[in-house]
């Protein structure tokens, strides 16, 4: 694997390996990684417990996407906080296997994510893209509604990735909003 930060989604249908875009969307990746590793304070699971492990893919639309990350399993749950969108011009819904944040409108990101089956350009500028599938798109295509997300394993390759601090990256995104709101 190339240097970088990866998320391995382990399901009963197999594994999905995603390269995360921590260099382009650091706050969003910081939130995801910190939740996955159990380091993010939230209102659902105690700190130290991995947030995504044992959740389900609560929404699956064939030929569109699979969605997970809802602690209630209904699409209405979140970690007890919301955060800003983080768009980057080079990150588009331009292929199958795009990992992005599910939301209910601007600045309503929490823990829910989706992975696409096909290009979905109408979602550009509405949902933060923060990774791409590099192995296991066949697993994405096989996941059915209600399937378990057994675990999410974060893999760090290279010195920069090893030293990257997910919490600091997320706090930086929140800090940027506070500065913008104060201006």
Which ranges hold each PLM region?
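Cyclophilin-like peptidyl-prolyl cis-trans isomerases
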Residues: 1-183
């Amino acid at each position: 694997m190339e240097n970088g930060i990866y998320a391995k989604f382990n399901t009963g249908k197999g594994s999905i390996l995603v390269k995360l875009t921590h260099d382009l969307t650091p706050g969003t990746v910081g939130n995801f990684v910190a939740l996955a590793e159990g380091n993010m304070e939230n209102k659902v699971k105690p700190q130290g417990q991995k947030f995504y492990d044992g959740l389900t893919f609560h929404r699956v639309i064939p030929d569109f996407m699979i969605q997970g990350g809802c602690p209630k399993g209904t699409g209405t749950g979140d970690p007890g906080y919301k955060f800003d969108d983080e768009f980057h011009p080079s990150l588009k819904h331009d292929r199958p296997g795009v990992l992005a944040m599910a939301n209910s409108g601007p600045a309503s990101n929490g823990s829910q994510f989706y992975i696409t089956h096909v290009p979905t350009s109408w979602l550009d500028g509405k949902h933060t893209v923060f990774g791409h599938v590099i192995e296991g798109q066949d697993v994405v295509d096989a996941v059915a509604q209600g399937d378990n997300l057994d675990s999410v394993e974060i893999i760090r390759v290279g010195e920069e990735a090893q030293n990257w601090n997910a919490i600091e990256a997320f706090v930086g995104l929140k800090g940027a909003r506070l500065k913008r709101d104060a201006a």
